[in-house]
C-alpha cells in the first residue's frame, strides 16, 4: 500500500472466498476488505455470508471480534447458549471466546465483522478450531436481558433525532440509546467498553445531505462500511 488508506468498492466483495482455517465450513465465504496485506495493524474488517443450511465450525480467536448483521437471520452459539440474530443486531466476542455460526433459515445470512488487532496470515489468522457443546434452542436477542449484555440492536428509528422520546423507544432510555448529533451528523455508539470491548469500537453514523466532518486524524485506524447512500471523502488529499 503506497498510502495510509485503502478504498474498496462494493463489487469487489464478489472475490469472497472461504478462509483456510474454515475449510470444514459449509456454505461460508468471507471478503477480507481490510487486513494485514493492506498494512493494517489494528484492524481486520470483512463481510461474511452463510448460505441456508450453512455452518461455520466452532472456533476462537486471539483477537477481539465485533459483528453487525446486514441481512437474513442466523444463530450464534457460545458457551452461554444459542442466540438468534437478524438485520440490525450487533455484538462483541472477547478474545478467546469459542463460538459457532449457523444458518437454519431459508435465505443467506450476511454480516460485517471487525477484528482487532489485525489477524496475521503467518499464524493461521490467529484463529483456532475448538470443540463447543450443543447450545440448544436459540433465544431471540433481548437487549434488556443481562444474559445478552454484549449484544444490541439498531434500526433507522434509533438514528432519528426526532424519535428519541421514551414512548417511541422499545427499550429503556439510557446511554445505550443516546445519540450524538452535530454538524449534520448523527452518531450512535454500538460496541465499546459498555459491552466490555477493550481493543476496538463500532458505531453507526448518519449524514444529513449537508452533513460535514471536517479534516481530522486519529491515533488509531478507522474503517467505514457504507450501508446506503453516497458520501464524499478526502483521504491523504485524494478525493473519493
Predicted features and spans:
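Conserved short histidine dyad/triad with adjacent acidic residue
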Residues: 27-34, 46-61, 184-187, 203-218
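A short, N-terminal "cap"/entry segment at the start of jelly-roll beta-barrel domains
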Residues: 1-42, 126-199
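A short beta-strand-loop-beta hairpin characteristic of the jelly-roll/cupin
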Residues: 55-87, 217-240
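Ligand-binding loop in jelly-roll beta-barrel domains
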Residues: 40, 75, 86-89, 95-123, ...
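Conserved hydrophobic/aromatic beta-strand scaffold that supports enzyme active sites
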Residues: 45-49, 66, 82, 90-92, ...
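Structured core of small recognition/catalytic domains
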Residues: 176-178, 183-240
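Short, low-complexity cationic-aromatic patches
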Residues: 38-39, 58-62, 118, 193-198, ...
Amino acid at each position: 500500500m503506497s498510502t495510509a488508506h485503502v478504498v474498496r468498492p462494493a463489487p469487489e466483495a464478489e472475490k469472497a472466498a472461504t478462509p483456510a482455517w474454515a475449510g470444514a465450513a459449509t456454505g461460508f465465504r468471507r471478503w477480507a476488505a481490510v487486513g494485514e496485506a493492506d498494512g493494517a495493524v489494528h484492524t481486520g474488517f470483512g463481510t461474511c455470508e452463510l448460505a441456508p443450511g450453512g455452518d461455520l465450525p466452532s472456533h476462537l480467536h486471539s483477537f477481539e471480534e465485533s459483528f453487525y448483521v446486514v441481512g437474513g437471520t442466523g444463530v450464534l452459539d457460545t458457551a452461554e447458549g444459542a442466540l438468534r440474530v437478524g438485520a440490525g443486531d450487533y455484538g462483541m466476542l472477547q478474545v478467546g471466546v469459542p463460538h459457532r455460526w449457523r444458518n437454519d433459515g431459508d435465505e443467506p445470512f450476511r454480516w460485517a465483522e471487525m477484528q482487532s488487532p489485525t489477524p496475521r496470515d503467518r499464524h493461521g489468522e490467529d484463529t483456532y478450531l475448538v470443540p463447543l457443546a450443543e447450545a440448544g434452542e436459540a433465544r431471540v436477542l433481548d437487549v434488556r436481558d443481562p444474559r445478552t449484555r454484549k449484544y444490541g440492536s439498531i434500526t433507522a428509528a434509533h438514528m432519528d433525532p426526532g424519535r428519541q422520546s421514551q414512548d417511541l423507544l422499545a427499550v429503556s432510555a439510557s446511554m445505550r440509546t443516546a445519540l450524538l448529533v452535530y454538524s449534520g451528523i448523527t452518531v450512535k455508539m454500538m460496541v465499546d467498553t459498555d459491552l466490555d470491548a477493550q481493543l476496538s469500537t463500532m458505531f453507526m453514523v448518519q449524514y444529513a445531505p449537508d452533513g460535514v466532518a471536517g479534516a481530522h486524524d486519529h491515533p488509531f485506524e478507522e474503517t467505514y462500511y457504507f450501508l446506503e447512500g453516497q458520501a464524499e471523502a478526502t483521504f491523504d488529499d485524494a478525493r473519493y
